[in-house]
């Protein structure tokens, strides 16, 4: 299945994303997917060859969203601290807009077949590398203290990725308020003593 899908394929991706998050990949059957779409199970195979292919398509779409919206913030021609601040905000906005898709990266990537899992791990690693590069650039130009780049990247992304598990749009905080708090906690903690990062507010 291609990511630029026809309407019926788009409906299938949406149904699979919802059911995989609600029930888990292994507990969701092809019959469940067919019933969610109001079609016969056999008709699903006009669009996909297997459930594994469907999960792969969903995860590919998740990484496409991050590459389209967050990667440009990290790769921008701007000071490293500004790149990181903007990327935290945009990652959380993507997570809020596409919570089901992004949560599946964390909980179902391991469910893919070995070759497809390898492909997704490569995409995940490439995305994480962008964050580490921005952190390293910040250390190099003096905006950030000399910290362990790998651990700093893991810390920021772990908290940003877990956001999909607890954030509620009708809760007390807006997405940008949460992002500002994360900027203060992480970027503030990595800056030279006595400095504080700017927020979007």
Give the positions of each predicted feature.
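N-terminal intrinsically disordered/low-complexity leader segments
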Residues: 1-7, 14, 194-201
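Helix-turn-helix
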Residues: 11, 15, 19-53, 57
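Hydrophobic alpha-helical connector segments
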Residues: 57, 71-100, 152-156
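Short, solvent-exposed amphipathic helices
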Residues: 61, 72, 90, 100-104, ...
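Amphipathic alpha-helical packing segments from all-alpha helical-bundle domains
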Residues: 64-67, 115-140, 150-154, 177
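Amphipathic alpha-helical segments used for helix-helix packing
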Residues: 83, 96-115, 165
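C-terminal peripheral helix-coil segments that are non-catalytic and often amphipathic
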Residues: 90-93, 97, 129-140, 159, ...
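Short, hydrophobic secondary-structure boundary micro-motifs
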Residues: 103-106, 147, 197-199
């Amino acid at each position: 299945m291609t990511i630029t899908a026809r309407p019926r394929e788009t409906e299938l991706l949406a149904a699979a994303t919802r059911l995989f998050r609600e029930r888990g990949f292994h507990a969701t059957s092809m019959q469940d997917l067919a019933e969610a779409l109001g079609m016969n199970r056999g008709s699903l195979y006009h669009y996909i060859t297997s459930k594994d292919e469907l999960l792969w398509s969903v995860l590919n779409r998740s990484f496409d969203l991050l590459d389209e919206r967050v990667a440009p913030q990290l790769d921008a021609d701007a000071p490293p601290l500004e790149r990181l601040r903007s990327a935290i905000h945009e990652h959380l906005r993507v997570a809020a807009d596409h919570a089901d898709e992004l949560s599946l990266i964390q909980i179902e990537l391991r469910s893919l077949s070995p070759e497809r899992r390898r492909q997704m791990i490569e995409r995940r690693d490439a995305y994480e590398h962008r964050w580490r590069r921005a952190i390293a650039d910040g250390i190099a130009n003096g905006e950030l203290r000399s910290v362990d780049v790998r651990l700093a990247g893991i810390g920021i992304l772990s908290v940003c990725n877990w956001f999909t598990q607890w954030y509620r749009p009708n809760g007390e905080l807006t997405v940008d308020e949460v992002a500002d708090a994360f900027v203060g906690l992480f970027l503030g903690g990595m800056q030279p003593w006595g400095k504080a990062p700017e927020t979007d507010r």
